Amino acid sequence: MKKRASVRKICQKCRLTRRRGRIRVICSNPRHKKRQG
């Protein structure tokens, strides 16, 4: 999981979700996992 200042979708399977006030990217590819803040 990487922490980024800005998160966006990398591929078609990436999904942006909000958990506990943080924006996360969930994807079938583990390399695409990241959160904001």
Swiss-Prot record:
Keyword field: Chloroplast, Plastid, Ribonucleoprotein, Ribosomal protein
A molecular function (GO) term: structural constituent of ribosome
Recorded superkingdom: Eukaryota
UniProt main location, coarse: plastid
Compartments in which it is found: Plastid, Chloroplast
One GO process term, biological-process aspect: translation
GO cellular component, one term: ribonucleoprotein complex
A UniProt-annotated Pfam family: Ribosomal_L36
PANTHER family, A to Z: 50S RIBOSOMAL PROTEIN L36, CHLOROPLASTIC (PTHR42888), LARGE RIBOSOMAL SUBUNIT PROTEIN BL36C (PTHR42888:SF1)
Family: Belongs to the bacterial ribosomal protein bL36 family.
Name of the protein described by the UniProt record: Large ribosomal subunit protein bL36c
Gene: rpl36
